[in-house]
């Protein structure tokens, strides 16, 4: 290797080498000034970063907040307050000490003035814990001594006065337990004295009697009950004198002084002794007033006469109407129905037959036009499109030609003349009846296939198609229907040499010859024909 001695020497290069390494490929010496580390100065201080890992143990850890953000401050001075509770316990022992006449008084003082060393929150939780513990102990003691304390009645009177006093903490705890014990006993023994059950039942029964009596008096005017008398209180011999009193009870002229029948005697309490003598004296007077038995029979007949009076108390029938002077009943409901019938059907009422006929004639008459002193009537027949829907079909007038078949006046006719009115646009057709050979004439009617379209229309017959099986010399044919029935001797219309045309088509034999037949009340007539070739069969 070649070694070249450096020409550049600087003071800042403490670790500079005197020789330089040559490149392996070029074999050219590389100067030291190319690298920036060669320009460092000894006067520039160097900074060294050192990372030290250690473990720090704190006295107390916090699970809620960070250790470096926890602060502590002394609590403010608690307020100085105090309470004095004076509990006076009065106990009477009836079972164990019946001869004891004196009362025991016990005064308990409680002072809660000095609580400087306690925190309010801690004291509150401690007080609640003590209260729950004391309640559990009291419940246990009560279960053990419930038989011994059944006759004791405990009354407590507490007077609270706000005045701070000094006392030890042990006295405060003892007074707190005694106070809780006294309060617990007072709450349990307060509801022990109950009223006697017979008094409560008697009051309840009396209230039920009053309620029933008031309700029956409102619903039944003939009901009246005198609670001062009961049949179970009367002697046995008063039963004879009690029968006429029943008749006076149902009579219309009653008075409150009379003896009434008690329907709820089983629920009424017994009256006082002073009222018993009064009721007996009245019963003796009633016995003297009825000397003989026929008077009771007359009273019984009087009861029968007054029986229809009870039907008046029944609710009347809910009828909507009135009675006239002749005693005939007229219903308001039927009158309303008749009024509605007159409004909806003004021409069908039984009092206006002549009006109905005049209106119908005016409707069928149609418009009237006078021309050159001649009165022309145009009759419009609207219901024709709906009368024979199964036997006819509507045909527009611009499709009808002379020789076609139409229904004129309800008869199948062949058209021989057509006339059109330039003013109204109606078509008038004249035709010959195919069965009776009579002339029929009729005008077209207006149909509305769409709301804004008006078309002059006529009715045409519905044709039946029969298969021709044979031809006869008398001008009749034998045909078969679509259901397979065979029709014998069907006549053919004579106009237009139709029979000759059918015979020519049938003799050619190029297809099936079909006859078009119209029906008129069971009579059939062949009016046309058509040939269906073999390709269509």
UniProtKB/Swiss-Prot annotation:
The lineage of its organism: Eukaryota, Fungi, Dikarya, Ascomycota, Pezizomycotina. Belongs to the eIF-5A family. Hex1 subfamily. GO terms for biological process: positive regulation of translational elongation; response to wounding; translational elongation. Keywords: Cytoplasm. Residues 1-17, 59-70, 116-134, 272-281 have a biased composition (Basic and acidic residues). Signal peptide: none annotated. Residues 135-144 have a biased composition (Low complexity). Forms oligomers. Self-assembles into hexagonal rods. Binds directly or indirectly to the Woronin body tether lah. Major component of Woronin bodies, fungal-specific organelles that occlude septal pores in order to separate intact from damaged compartments. HexA binds directly or indirectly to the Woronin body tether that in turn is anchored at the rim of the septal pore. Woronin bodies are important for stress resistance and virulence. It comes from the Eukaryota. This is Woronin body major protein hexA. GO terms for molecular function: ribosome binding; RNA binding; translation elongation factor activity. One of its GO terms (cellular component) is Woronin body. InterPro entries: Hex1_S1 (IPR037318), IF5A-like (IPR001884), NA-bd_OB-fold (IPR012340), Rib_uL2_dom2 (IPR014722), Translation_prot_SH3-like_sf (IPR008991). Disruption phenotype: Leads to an increased sensitivity to stressors that affect the integrity of the cell wall and membrane, such as SDS, the antifungal agent fludioxonil, the acyclic sesquiterpene alcohol farnesol and the cell wall perturbing agents Calcofluor White and Congo Red. Does not affect the resistance to hypo-osmotic stress but leads to a higher sensitivity to physical damage. Results in the lack of Woronin bodies. Attenuates virulence in a murine model of infection. It comes from Aspergillus fumigatus (strain ATCC MYA-4609 / CBS 101355 / FGSC A1100 / Af293). Coiled coil: none annotated.
